[in-house]
Every structure is written in structure tokens, then in C-alpha cells.
Amino acid sequence: MKAVLIPGDGIGREIAESVREVSAALNTGIEWQEFAAGAEYAAESGELIAPGTLDAIEACGWALKGPTATPIGKGFRSINVQLRQRFSTYANLRLVHTLPGVPTRFDNVDLVIVRENTEDLYKGIEYMLNDEIANGVKLITRPACEKICRFAFDYARKNGRKKVTAVHKANIMKLTDGLFLSTFREVAAEYPEIAADDCIIDALCMKLVQKPEQFDVLVAPNLYGDIISDLCAGLVGGLGFAPSANIGDSTRIYEAVHGSAPDIAGQDKANPSAILMAFAMMLNDLGETDKAAKLNAAILAQVEEGKVVTADIGGTAGTKEFTQAVIARL
């Protein structure tokens, strides 16, 4: 089968090569179609995404991407947001769990974050009323709320999860977040075997850093989902172990959600774990459950052993050496 591979910026090319090597070692038979995208490509070509990229994703329905840089305060819109809206990948799925061998404050984190991916403030509707007033539109629709809440409960049912918590600020944004919360409660009534509750976003952040094990599945509008995704990654060792899937009706885009790390780009220092774990998510969704399980087990065993690991978790190994160690375990 064919799948699109977008290395992205900074360390992206190095960790994308790790994917190619692991894919070959697992005999997946995937034919990778590689396309450039990101700030570096834009500086060279004047285009954010290489010609043919979107058509290729549309044709095969599967893509895996590395980090792409986005300028702060000005310049082009996030490529991630553009891809999500272009292909209506309405659900962002982030799996967060404690990894043996990675030092953290908690040893029992096991969370799933389901983030609405297409609207909210990320719709990009903002404008200047005059030189001193900027306005942004928080767009929330009932169909999108229902779709993401149903996705969260379906995921919980399929994967043996016991509780789904809605994240909101409906005490202040009574119409927009109020619509999200009321829709969540309507959908929850259809899943009586799954516990359902809700938590205000600021209170949730406090509870996550105090006792994260009290949560199971979190479902949130776009902005809150973005914030708590990184917060939860910090609970288990950082974005170096944060794979993500963007799921639509006909397209799935998997990604490493960490930054492009330009300060170590090209130096063989990057930890490829996140993109390899995202690749494992992709294999699982392709029905290659055994290969996905083997890859995850190899990564976890390598990290737990703690000998041949990258600098971000206390080791001295480079990207290539770590990748080869994982392959040896396969």
C-alpha cells in the first residue's frame, strides 16, 4: 500500500528516516511517498506544501508527518491546522501513559485525549477592527460537538475505558462552551455503561498535576484540547513520547507533535520515539496489530533498559543508534 511521509522541518528528516528503516525491518510493504512541507521548504520555494502532497494524501488516505514550524504572531498559518481542515480530520487522538525508564513525577498515568480538530478559535477567523482592537471568533457547532463526543464514547467502549470527561469553560462562555457541554450530555446518555462527567478547564489543569490517575478519557474543544495535550505529555516525560493521530472519515494523518528542534537538527541527537509510536498507531489502524504491538514493545523495552537512549532521557545515543537498537529488538 501507499502512504505519504512528510518529514517537515528541523529534525524531521532524521526521524523520518527512522520510520523508513523500522518500516522496512517490519516488512510492512508500505510504499512511502515523500513530500516536503514547512518553513524550510517555504524559504526555498515560496510554497508551504510541495505540489502533489494534498492529492497524494487524498488518493491513499494515510499520512505520517514530522514537525513543522509555525511563526508566532505573524506569517503563515499552521500547516497542521491547514491539513486538519482540508481533510476534515475532526478528531485528534493523543495517548498518554507512563513509560518505564522515563523519570517523571507520576508512575500511573494512563490517559486518552480526544480533541475536536476543525473549529473553535483555530478556525482562524480573526481581524482588526481598527489599529487598537483585534477580534477573533470562537466557532462551535452542534454537529462538530456531537461528532467528537460520539467519537470519544465509541473509543471508550471499544477500548474498555470506563469514564469520559468533558473539558469546558461553560461557566463563562455560556453559549459556545455551553453548546459543547449540553451536546456532550446528550451523547453521554446513549452510553449508559460509561461514566460521564465534566470539568472546567482551569480546574482540570490543577487536578491533572495533582492526581492524573483520576481521569480516563478527556474530550475537549480544539483550544483546550491543544493545551491539555502538551500538559499531559509533560506528565509522562515530555513531547518526545507524544504520538498523535488526526482522524477523519476517509483520511488519517499521524504525527509527532513535538517541535522541529532546529538547535539540534542535522546532529543525530533527536529522539525518534514519538514518530515511531505514531507509526505504531498507524499500523494498528491499518490492521497490522501484531506489528504495531511489536514496535511499541521494542521502544518501551529500549527506553526502560536505559542504555542506548537519547540525551533527552539521560543517554548518549544518537538518533541512528537508538533506531538500530529498536530494530534489533524487533
Residue ranges of predicted features:
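Glycine-rich phosphate/diphosphate-binding loop of Rossmann-like nucleotide-binding domains
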Residues: V4-A25, N130-D202, Q214
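N-terminal beta-loop-helix "entrance" segment that forms/cooperates
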Residues: I30-G52, L208
